[in-house]
Curated annotation (Swiss-Prot):
Gene Ontology molecular function: ammonia-lyase activity; phenylalanine ammonia-lyase activity
NCBIfam families: phe_am_lyase
Name of the protein this chain belongs to: Phenylalanine ammonia-lyase
Binding-site residues, (E)-cinnamate: 256, 344, 350, 380, 452, 480, 483
PROSITE patterns (UniProt xref): PAL_HISTIDASE (PS00488)
UniProt catalytic activity: L-phenylalanine = (E)-cinnamate + NH4(+)
Listed InterPro entries: Aromatic_Lyase (IPR001106), Fumarase/histidase_N (IPR024083), L-Aspartase-like (IPR008948), Phe/His_NH3-lyase_AS (IPR022313), Phe_NH3-lyase (IPR005922), Phe_NH3-lyase_shielding_dom_sf (IPR023144)
Species this chain originates from: Nicotiana tabacum
PTM section of the record: Contains an active site 4-methylidene-imidazol-5-one (MIO), which is formed autocatalytically by cyclization and dehydration of residues Ala-Ser-Gly.
Cross-link (5-imidazolinone (Ala-Gly)): 198-200
Function: This is a key enzyme of plant metabolism catalyzing the first reaction in the biosynthesis from L-phenylalanine of a wide variety of natural products based on the phenylpropane skeleton.
């Protein structure tokens, strides 16, 4: 700040020699980790007061005011320090009008008809609001053609913030009235469509102005969802003194800005940033349940690629996997039996940091662009009191919003594509390293198809998300008698990005439920394998150790190889009928005995030392006891008394599992139960939409110091 002019307007030193083009400021805003930024956003979202001064509004604060659950707890306060500047610009307009100064929108017509002139400034503003009330609502205050109340609240907040900077020629009292509407949860009804954001969001913002001026067609929604006319809205909000008679320039100040698009964009980007972190953690959990090889997160790999988003994504996944009980078990398996799975994991796992990194960078960049926009002055003309002039320009052009929303939507679609790729591997027993097909957890796979329907739903979600990735901003139509021949379409793009966020939430919630299912299946797998191993060992000792006369039998040496078969064989390949001759367990156990018999040489000719003679006894004994032991192990787990505890409790990803299973009560799904996958996914989706899942997500990363593990 350089000082204060005589008329009270703050005089900005915009021609500073340091960073005159704002590139340094833009770069500085990206310092630090994305995760720290998300944590800061969450903290700001939860603060009880949003203080507006015109220059420090954040997307998190906009999202907080917009959120339905926050309307009674988060309030807006205006900076009293801004009053003088706002008054100075308003006074300047009235003075210039009195002096006969010719100013756009004050003494002239609008747009392509700005050649017209009038001295009746108040009537001109009244007509501006009337002809811009061109929206169509259909029936009801929340019809499909009405902007959601959250979007309207966001727009109101952003518009107040812009006008507080004192370049727009509007009275402070009008800003106070809009603030009262926000704080008393009285929301004007705005049309969903009808803006191209070339001269600002003219049509929707005119309905806020219509309510303030008491237009008979204006409507609002009250604190309890009731429909209010303008008079009732003022009474409920405690706005005294009657409706506003707009002075010259005030109508233009209210409508000629980008607040609707940038407000919705702020809401969208708050969610998008959280979803980006969520996708990183889900990718790490995917690596855990797939017995993945953690070297894909090694810092050297990503440091050599240079991209910060990729480096951070890898470091976050590395942190989750570091010390993971699943990773330790998988590493032991890979060391002792390196041929049991491919040398490298598939791309959806192995290249997830490379895939997610650019999307995080795009979302972060879009967030900064929108934060600059919501703190900008974006109407026309701008009142420069210090130089005693009105500047005619084009800050109402919402291109930063349209472009950032197109980019963010493409990033969200890419995140969804990765999620679908991971989900498809997870439910496919050809790829998932021993998990059952469709993640079925029931006793009879012929009557349990697990997540088959969910995979179909995921394909649907992903297809729609990929369609939404198509850009909006290349569909510009010349408008308003070719005066607005280029326009940003920012609200359309923001709306489509809001749809994309909603679909990615559907995908994320479905995927998380599937990952929790996989975690429980790994737990079941471990307990069943333990039961089978113990049973095979005991049966081998009883039937293979001694001969008929009590002598040691050559078949006693088979036990180690029999147990190796149990270790190597996928449990769910035989779990529904462990002793079936058609399943690989019994086939391979028999093959071990046959191989030992073939190596037994001349001893096979002696009935007392023949291993072949022992095969039938071993199999009969095993068939008699193994099914009972398998069922007993399953029943013990279902009753909460498993022989082996769930590994997830020893992992940094545990908070998300605990949230789903504990707080939400979403259970392991089987065909034996009535509950459907959609019911459980709905619980997670609702929690995600309400922000309930954020704390558990961040708890997974609470120990991360913001840096990758050292290269050693």
């Amino acid at each position: 700040m350089a000082g204060v002019a005589q008329n009270g307007h703050q005089e900005m030193d915009f021609c500073m020699k340091v960073d005159p083009l704002n590139w340094e400021m833009a770069a500085d805003s990206l310092k630090g980790s994305h995760l720290d930024e998300v944590k800061k956003m969450v903290a700001e979202f939860r603060k009880p007061v949003v203080k507006l001064g015109g220059e420090t509004l954040t997307v998190a604060q906009v999202a907080a005011i917009a959120a339905k659950d926050n309307v009674k707890t988060v309030k807006v306060e205006l900076s009293e320090g801004a009053r003088a500047g706002v008054k100075a610009s308003s006074d300047w307009v009235m003075d210039s009008m009195g002096k006969g100064t010719d100013s756009y929108g004050v003494t002239t017509g609008f747009g392509a008809t700005s050649h017209r002139r009038t001295k009746n400034g108040g009537a001109l503003q009244k007509e501006l609001i009337r002809f811009l009330n061109a929206g169509v609502f259909g029936n009801g205050t929340e019809s499909c053609h009405t902007l959601p109340q959250s979007g309207t609240r966001a727009a109101m907040l952003v518009r107040i913030n812009t006008l507080l900077q004192g370049y727009s020629g509007i009275r402070f009292e009008i800003l106070e009235a809009i603030t009262k509407l926000l704080n008393h949860n009285v929301t004007p009804c705005l049309p969903l469509r009808g803006t191209i954001t070339a001269s600002g969001d003219l049509v929707p913002l005119s309905y806020i102005a219509g309510l303030l001026t008491g237009r008979p067609n204006s409507k609002a929604v009250g604190p309890n969802g009731e429909t209010l006319n303008a008079e009732e809205a003022f009474r409920v909000a405690g706005v005294n003194g009657g409706f506003f008679e707009l002075q010259p320039k005030e109508g233009l100040a209210l409508v000629n800005g980008t607040a609707v698009g940038s407000g919705l964009a702020s809401m969208v980007l708050f969610d998008a940033n959280v979803l980006a972190v969520f996708s990183e953690v889900l990718s790490a959990i995917f690596a855990e349940v797939m017995n993945g090889k953690p070297e894909f997160t090694d810092h050297l790999t990503h440091k050599l690629k240079h991209h910060p988003g990729q480096i951070e994504a890898a470091a976050i996944m590395e942190h989750i996997l570091d010390g993971s009980s699943y990773v330790k078990a998988a590493q032991k398996l890979h060391e002792t039996d390196p041929l049991q799975k491919p040398k490298q994991d598939r791309y959806a796992l192995r290249t997830s940091p490379q895939w997610l990194g650019p999307q995080i960078e795009v979302i972060r960049s879009a967030t900064k662009m929108i934060e600059r926009e919501i703190n900008s002055v974006n109407d026309n003309p701008l009142i420069d009191v210090s130089r005693n002039k009105a500047l005619h320009g084009g800050n109402f052009q919402g291109t930063p919003i349209g472009v950032s929303m197109d980019n963010a939507r493409l990033a969200l679609a890419s995140i969804g594509k990765l999620m679908f790729g991971q989900f498809s591997e997870l439910v496919n027993d050809y790829y998932n390293n021993g998990l059952p097909s469709n993640l079925t957890a029931g006793r009879n796979p012929s009557l349990d198809y697990g997540f088959k329907g969910s995979e179909i739903a995921m394909a649907s979600y992903c297809s729609e998300l990929q369609f939404l990735a198509n850009p909006v901003t290349n569909h510009v139509q010349s408008a308003e008698q070719h005066n607005q021949d280029v326009n940003s379409l920012d609200l359309i793009s923001a709306r489509k990005t809001a749809e994309a966020v909603d679909i990615l939430k559907l995908m994320s919630s479905t995927y998380l439920v599937a990952l929790c299912q996989a975690i429980d299946l790994r737990h079941l797998e471990e307990n069943l394998r333990n039961a089978v191993k113990n049973t095979v060992s005991q049966v081998a000792k009883r039937t293979l150790t001694m001969g008929t006369n009590g002598e040691l039998h050559p078949s006693r040496f088979c036990e180690k190889d029999l147990l190796r078969v149990v270790d190597r064989e996928y449990v769910f390949a035989y779990a529904d009928d462990a002793c079936s001759a058609n399943y690989p367990l019994m086939q391979k156990l028999r093959q071990v005995l046959v191989d030992h018999a073939l190596q037994n040489g001349e001893n096979e000719k002696n009935a007392n030392s023949s291993i072949f003679q022992k095969i039938l006894a071993f199999e009969d004994e095993l068939k008699a006891v193994l099914p009972k032991e398998v069922e007993s192990a399953r029943a013990a787990l279902e009753s909460g008394n498993p022989a082996i505890a769930n590994r997830i409790k020893e992992c940094r990803s545990y908070p998300l599992y605990r949230f789903v299973r504990g707080e939400l009560g979403a259970e392991l799904l089987t065909g034996e139960k009535v509950r459907s996958p959609g019911e459980e996914c709905d619980k997670v989706f609702t929690a995600m939409c309400n922000g309930q899942i954020i704390d558990s997500l961040l708890e997974c990363l609470k120990e991360w110091n913001g840096a990758p593990l050292p290269i050693c």
